[in-house]
Amino acid sequence: MQTRNTFSWIKEQITRSISVSLMIYIITRTSISNAYPIFAQQGYENPREATGRIVCANCHLANKPVDIEVPQAVLPDTVFEAVVRIPYDMQMKQVLANGKRGALNVGAVLILPEGFELAPPDRISPEMKEKIGNLSFQNYRPTKKNILVIGPVPGQKYSEITFPILSPDPATKKDVHFLKYPIYVGGNRGRGQIYPDGSKSNNTVYNATAAGIVSKIIRKEKGGYEITIADASDGRQVVDIIPPGPELLVSEGESIKLDQPLTSNPNVGGFGQGDAEIVLQDPLRIQGLLFFLSSVILAQIFLVLKKKQFEKVQLSEMNF
């Protein structure tokens, strides 16, 4: 009897462990599929390559514009706005993972100079919080607080993203200096064409993997196609699988060439990158400049007064 109870207890524990593991897997998989910045975070230690290219372009193949606006100069330990604009036609719809059409999402990566970081909530003004909305920013790495990522978020609401940034203070951070620094940004709208493992998404064009005659086209129940190509040279048959989403361009009996497009290109999004410069200004330099300008103005005033006094003396001598 005791052996049977022990066996039941072990069986219950194993079942519970499997259930917990399955739940963790589902949650993890869902978060990865819904948050594409994590692809870059998992695959690259730094999102900006030595060539200056931001790695998001490896998956988002189309080139689109992006714009960044930052102040020309900031003082130490100051919160300022870095505004990233990701423009696109709001009427456009993209191909979703299930092959249906839907609205575009946007995402961005902001690469700040060393020492600059996301401003803490208690330092952000109410006006800036209103511009930020419900956005949640995260660091690219726990050790890289100067690199921020956001997305995917609804493009119709957040085609303009405001990052709250805290400038460093050289008085407390000895590796930071009063200099001009570059800021780099990358922004995408819509889904990518290639996954990090090199496989294609359904948001791209599919080409023929062999030359020959299209002998059979099967429309799959859940969408997509199976295209059978009979190779004219050796008679072998090649089957190309088309996922749901792209529109078919070929028909049965048609002669096709190697790498000829079998589908349209459904992609309406793309990725772009840009840069800006910002000066970490020394307050003492500003004070010195103000003192210099004040001295110049006072000197001009004294010159004018001296000139008028001299003219009065000349006039009195002439009258005498």
UniProtKB/Swiss-Prot annotation:
UniProt keyword list: Chloroplast, Electron transport, Heme, Iron, Membrane, Metal-binding, Photosynthesis, Plastid, Signal, Thylakoid, Transmembrane, Transmembrane helix, Transport
Record flagged with keyword Signal: yes
Residues annotated as signal peptide: 1-35
Cellular location(s): Plastid, Chloroplast thylakoid membrane
Cofactor note as given: Binds 1 heme group covalently.
InterPro entries linked to this entry: Cyt-f_TM (IPR024058), Cyt_f (IPR002325), Cyt_f_lg_dom (IPR024094), Cyt_f_lg_dom_sf (IPR036826), Rudment_hybrid_motif (IPR011054)
Binding-site list for heme: 36, 56, 59-60
Ranges that cross the membrane: 286-306
Domain of life from the UniProt record: Eukaryota
Cited function: Component of the cytochrome b6-f complex, which mediates electron transfer between photosystem II (PSII) and photosystem I (PSI), cyclic electron flow around PSI, and state transitions.
Annotated protein name in UniProt: Cytochrome f
Species for this entry: Vitis vinifera
